[in-house]
Amino acid sequence: MPEREFLHLDVEGVKAIHAEVLGAHGGSTGLRDVGLLESAVAAPQASFGGEPLIKDLIEIAAAYLFYLCRNHPFVDGNKRTALAASLVFLKENGELKDPGLPARSIDAWETLVLDVAASRIDREETTVRLRRLLRRRKK
C-alpha cells in the first residue's frame, strides 16, 4: 500500500498562524530568527533518499510542536504558535474536525507545551503525550 502524503505547513502558513494567535491572545509581534523558523518548519518534512524520515501523522504533528517551541523563532507567542500549528496540521490532514482544545483537558495541553519549552521532554515523548491527549480528546 502506498504511503499517505500529508499536507505540510510552510513558513508563510506558520507566520499566519502566529499572527492569528497574537491577534486572539495578545503579545509582541516580530520574527526573532527566520532561519530558526525555516528549520522548525523543515524538520518534520525531512527525507533521506526521497523517503520521509517521519511517516506517522501524529509524530509529524508532534515534531511541528517540538521544533517550533524549542527553536523559539518569534519574539513572543512561540509556545502558543507551536501548539496551534500542530493542531492546524492535524486538522488539514483530517485528524481533527476542530483544532480547538476542550476546556476539561486544557491543563494537560498546557503541561505538554511547557514541558517541551523547558526541555523536560524530547521529541519522542512529545509524540507519546500528544497521541495520548488526542485519544482523550476523541472520547
What annotation goes with each model-predicted range?
Residues 1-139:
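FIC/Doc superfamily catalytic core
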